[in-house]
Amino acid sequence: MSETTLNAAEQPIDELVSWVKQHDFSLNLTTERLAFLIAIAVLSNERFDEELGEGELHDAFTIVTRLFEETGEASAFRANNAINELVKQRLISRFTSEMTEGASIYRLSPLAIGITDYYVRHREFSKLRLSIQLSMVAGEMAKAIEAAKQGGTAGHWKKNVYAVLKYSVGEIFDQIDLNQRVMDEQQQSVKQQIADLLNKDWREAINNCESLLSETSNTLKELQDTLQAAGDELQTQILDIQELVYGDEELEFIEETLFGLQMKLDRITSWGQQAIDLWIGYDRHVHKFIRTAIDMDKNRIFSTRLRQSVKDYFDMPWYLTYADAERLSDLRDEALVLRDDEVTGQVPLEVEYEEFQQVNDELAERIGEMLRLHKDNGKPIDLGIVLKDYLAQHPSTHHFDLARIVIDQAVRMGYSESDYQAIQPDWQAINDYGAKVQANVIDRY
């Protein structure tokens, strides 16, 4: 949390609400108005004094209006209305002086800079940019450590240590945090692109989806490696300063600042691994969807490709390569009776000749009745809990077969909403012999 947010949080909410109401703050930016504001920001950055005249604002409005033909012509009247709207919303400030012979000059307000900065300057989050920011932080931390080792008066600590930590290091940490949030949005954008591709034509979209997934995965891994390497160094620097001020009550404000920096550093470094874990889950979800689509449509797609290949053979000749390998032997006999090594003695005549399939059907029916109670009562099915309770009632030698039947019956009952959100479930132990299951709670029937 930035210092500005901390200061705001210290004020009662009703006072802040009254302040907003008293000053009549409001924002209403249509797409055209936002484009106009961004155009003003771009032009301002090209000026040394970052000031624009009214004529330059009219020129910017004309450029924007060309791309928004449906809104009307770029008349001076409409341009003045747009400028006045931005002034009223405190997005640009208007000044008039004798030096400009009565003509107005305009500057972006801090609010406008924040808005345009988000859209213009924070759209690219690369490894190079992150490396530069982390190098700057390390340099500022080195200055603070050097000043702390020298020691001195309270004024020395406030000026050369506290100020560097709070305003230099803290601000760069906030900037990195903001860039990471932009990267989160970019991931959402990539997910939307993949969804659009799969909805249009998943057969043609497979290669594009794979490219988008791999590119994002590689970017996240590079960023995480950079964060991990720099994070260890920054952690050491924070601990060095903490050791120098430990136990000194007069320097307690330094310890509080270091505590805040430690929280920011932990959040920044943990972001990378969390982003990778979430993306891996989404990657698996997409591949599972594609495999399912291929299984459902494999005959049509393969036959279509084969016919097309034969048709185009003379224009684009091809070679057919095939492999003829021996089939693998299935060592599991489907006619085996469920094992029960814990039972000794003579098998009753009525079950002596029962085959596995018959036993399986009876078990499936009983398990289905057990799970149907969840469906009738509208309760979710947590397979981890259900399996653990059910398997505890049976010998360990039956656990594998029984767990498979329970899961098979459960997925027929319904599905989990979390599967469609690419949420990766945790592994849960289901018996005392190390068996685990990974499944989301079934909450839709």
UniProtKB/Swiss-Prot annotation:
InterPro entries: Chromosome_partition_MukF, MukF_C, MukF_C_sf, MukF_M, MukF_M_sp, MukF_WHTH, WH-like_DNA-bd_sf, WH_DNA-bd_sf. GO terms for molecular function: calcium ion binding. One of its GO terms (cellular component) is cytoplasm. Residues 213-241 are annotated as: Leucine-zipper. Its main location: cytoplasm. Interacts, and probably forms a ternary complex, with MukE and MukB via its C-terminal region. The complex formation is stimulated by calcium or magnesium. It is required for an interaction between MukE and MukB. Involved in chromosome condensation, segregation and cell cycle progression. May participate in facilitating chromosome segregation by condensation DNA from both sides of a centrally located replisome during cell division. Not required for mini-F plasmid partitioning. Probably acts via its interaction with MukB and MukE. Overexpression results in anucleate cells. It has a calcium binding activity. Belongs to the MukF family. This is Chromosome partition protein MukF. The lineage of its organism: Bacteria, Pseudomonadati, Pseudomonadota, Gammaproteobacteria, Vibrionales. The gene is mukF.
